[in-house]
Amino acid sequence: MVLPKSKNQIGLGRAIQSDFTKNRRNRKGGLKHIVDSDPKAHRAALRSVTHETDLDEFLNTAELGEVEFIAEKQNVTVIQNPEQNPFLLSKEEAARSKQKQEKNKDRLTIPRRPHWDQTTTAVELDRMERESFLNWRRNLAQLQDVEGFIVTPFERNLEIWRQLWRVIERSDVVVQIVDARNPLFFRSAHLEQYVKEVGPSKKNFLLVNKADMLTEEQRNYWSSYFNENNIPFLFFSARMAAEANERGEDLETYESTSSNEIPESLQADENDVHSSRIATLKVLEGIFEKFASTLPDGKTKMTFGLVGYPNVGKSSTINALVGSKKVSVSSTPGKTKHFQTINLSEKVSLLDCPGLVFPSFATTQADLVLDGVLPIDQLREYTGPSALMAERIPKEVLETLYTIRIRIKPIEEGGTGVPSAQEVLFPFARSRGFMRAHHGTPDDSRAARILLKDYVNGKLLYVHPPPNYPNSGSEFNKEHHQKIVSATSDSITEKLQRTAISDNTLSAESQLVDDEYFQENPHVRPMVKGTAVAMQGPVYKGRNTMQPFQRRLNDDASPKYPMNAQGKPLSRRKARQLTALELGVSPEALSSATSKKHNKKNKRSKQRSGVVIDDY
């Protein structure tokens, strides 16, 4: 039953109308109407204000002083350069930064261990080490915050530096292992100074690992630079040595290097001339043995300390020297956690120091990512490293290696001629199917991680030139990049020619293979949705029911059931009558023969089986 409607129109609509009537303006005053910008301005006059933001304070002061502001849009200039990545420096800024870093490079040191002797207790030594480490951290912070230098992320754990101190104190020769693609970045000159401070008789040696990535001309340039600056060095490749160990080859040479071309080890005069060839394991072992021949009296074994940045190949070098995997190796920086001692021979022992990131000047963090110092999987900002990679690797090399098409903005339209990060990442992501689910756009972050890892691993190769190289870095790597493009184009041309030589022969051969295969496998049937397919001999005679019309047609497309004049199938009753006429029986007899009514009788009554049992 519907409730009676109230005659008193009391409700929300009446309240809204009443409020509108009270607050409507007075039309007798004319068309002029003054409205406060803030509807609660009358309440704000009585509100206590104890704190204001900078913007509110500025506006309130201007309002009290009755100051009017006029916007002068013609004096505003918007500086916008979409082609310049904000996370990278321009060429002029990078040059100024390099010049400033060269003037202050002596201020960037490594922490020193305080002097101690037999009378120093463990508590006193721990306190002195902590104070020295804190003072070193304080000086670096002042260098960054006050003077604005960009310092690479360095090791902040005191325990790791203690491992380095112990390795230097125990070692007779400190071997710095550096990456051949950028040796000066991974070489620490302050470490060499500290080694001489700890023991004047200690010696420094530079082992340039991953030298197989450099061409012969590039190694010649670096060799001349090291010789001019009196830096003892040796080119080495731990990967090639490990592969040769697995093959069991006689490691005489990688590049026709004979035993008499072994660079002389560091003697007192240090006037040796080093070769630009890649040294073998026998050469490296010979240098270590020649060092050990200069042992002082009373010492039976010489210790070599291997130090360097993470992921430069310290553990791989030790494994190649020993001949088996004695040290844990990983592509993740910082795998070795504490120094380890390995006996190479009766006179030589090796100390594997954990990888340390020494403090050094850097222009941007993109350089640290491409040098393999910062882990790529933990990277958040990827446009800077990707743009720097696109500057170093030519567009043709990227297109050749990854079979993509990079379209850049023409110079006539304001482009720089160098692809940006998005112009490289988007085509690569589309070609690999890396798409974002929520927007449907290419997943450039995932593409950036793959390309950056290829750069760090050496697939995208870029070698930094020495400081005395007269030309640019692109000219220094021109030979290697041209080899990649020409080798890939030659292989593609060879495949096309090989395919076009004998198409008929290839097709005939493929037909023979198909015939032989299907004769040996007669029970092969198509894997399609439907009922099981019957196979009778080697000939396929089954038929899956995939469409409704298949039930009414035979294999030759003839109708399976009788049709009427209109081409439609007969009904069940008419089809039964037609069948009865063809068989010469009545339709009732045909229906009774196929009927199921004999199974539908009354089952509640008593059933007689009809079997007679004889009485005996």
From Swiss-Prot:
Top EC class of this enzyme: hydrolase
Region (Disordered): 247-269, 552-574, 587-616
Places the protein is found: Cytoplasm
Main location: cytoplasm
TM segment ranges: none
Family, similarity comment: Belongs to the TRAFAC class YlqF/YawG GTPase family. LSG1 subfamily.
Name of this protein: Large subunit GTPase 1
